[in-house]
């Protein structure tokens, strides 16, 4: 469960290392964001000499959460960290690599480019 002021790791090589959620895109009454939700975030830590800089406002899609995800078949998936992938306005990833495992639910939400870049899909 991601809410405003939550810090997230970045799971790609776009140049950002840590994000802070400032808004959840979608219905205005969403309090928490889950896997597959798009958020507006600010970059809190960035890699030097990269296109993304600290304090830049960007969009990101959540790919891992510490809160467990329950599937229809009864399987429960829980990750060790909260992580997101930086995307542009069209929903394409800004980086060229994705690190770590991501959930299969992203494919159903039309983030197929992120799924194809991921080394492992759970």
UniProtKB/Swiss-Prot annotation:
<keyword id="KW-0699">rRNA-binding</keyword>
<dbReference type="GO" id="GO:0006412">
    <property type="term" value="P:translation"/>
</dbReference>
<keyword id="KW-0689">Ribosomal protein</keyword>
<dbReference type="GO" id="GO:0070180">
    <property type="term" value="F:large ribosomal subunit rRNA binding"/>
</dbReference>
<keyword id="KW-0687">Ribonucleoprotein</keyword>
<dbReference type="Pfam" id="PF00238">
    <property type="entry name" value="Ribosomal_L14"/>
</dbReference>
<dbReference type="GO" id="GO:0022625">
    <property type="term" value="C:cytosolic large ribosomal subunit"/>
</dbReference>
<dbReference type="InterPro" id="IPR005745">
    <property type="entry name" value="Ribosomal_uL14_bac-type"/>
</dbReference>
<protein>
    <recommendedName>
        <fullName>Large ribosomal subunit protein uL14c</fullName>
    </recommendedName>
</protein>
<dbReference type="InterPro" id="IPR036853">
    <property type="entry name" value="Ribosomal_uL14_sf"/>
</dbReference>
<keyword id="KW-0934">Plastid</keyword>
<comment type="subunit">
    <text>Part of the 50S ribosomal subunit.</text>
</comment>
<dbReference type="GO" id="GO:0003735">
    <property type="term" value="F:structural constituent of ribosome"/>
</dbReference>
<comment type="similarity">
    <text>Belongs to the universal ribosomal protein uL14 family.</text>
</comment>
<comment type="function">
    <text>Binds to 23S rRNA.</text>
</comment>
<dbReference type="InterPro" id="IPR019972">
    <property type="entry name" value="Ribosomal_uL14_CS"/>
</dbReference>
<dbReference type="GO" id="GO:0009507">
    <property type="term" value="C:chloroplast"/>
</dbReference>
<keyword id="KW-0150">Chloroplast</keyword>
<dbReference type="InterPro" id="IPR000218">
    <property type="entry name" value="Ribosomal_uL14"/>
</dbReference>
<keyword id="KW-0694">RNA-binding</keyword>
